[in-house]
Amino acid sequence: MEFPRIQVFAGPTAVGKTAYAIEYALRNNGEIVSADSRQIFKELHIGTAKPSEAELRAVPHHFISEKNLSEPYSAGIFASEANARLADILAREKNPIVCGGSTLYLQALVYGLSEIPEAAAEVRNNLMIELSERGSKALFQELVLADPAYAQTLDPTKTQRLIRGLEVIRSTGKPISFFHQQQSRPPFTFDVTVLNRERKTLYERINLRVDQMLQEGLINEVQEILHAGFSPEINPLKTIGYQEPIAYLLGALSYEQMIALLKQHTRNYAKRQLTWFRRFEQQLLLY
């Protein structure tokens, strides 16, 4: 059986995915399906580099500003909803174009979902105790040795996925990367093109984007989110672009430190994305 082919444009943050996908969609009767774990939320705009109003008017977009921060959302939910949305776009004789850089969302969509066993509460509790006693760096090194494929996709400072990786290993004796290989076949064939730029150019674009976000009012956006009653501990706010301004607003960072960390964290994130994207043969260097 031949599955419908879907074009995917992936790539690191600030590479220019949105502009490229919009231009492609305009030429090919397309609609864009966003594979971005944060642009889905209505409250997050500047810090996620969400497409502008003009860009959203130019081409129909999906999974942009569709959920509230109070609604739980995950890669699994996204993959299920995205498959239905892709089928609907095709049924209307339009061309769906997936665009995004969230590796978990792309993994779930392109490779399908896998059933990863839940760990016993005791295992998680023990890991949380170890985290407080040994620190995240020690636990991350343990994960690197046990599941290097999964570890290379993580930010060592983010403990949620780190703990998840270790609890699966301790509960099942198998790494998460093993379960990722057992995924069910998605109902589409995805043609993934990874957009990239020379590293120096990419880093310059990242630094410029951070400066532009601050000029556009990132600090005010974060203040409004916190004043609306959202906890800084919810997962979408514990991400690059929001955690740094929150630390600044709470007095933990100076303004200059916040800018430097925001740029550094974003560059580090781009490196992790590119490591994951190496699995795809089709790479396109933009200039």
Give the location of each predicted region.
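Phosphate/pyrophosphate-binding catalytic cores of soluble transferases and nucleic-acid-acting enzymes
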Residues: M1-Y287
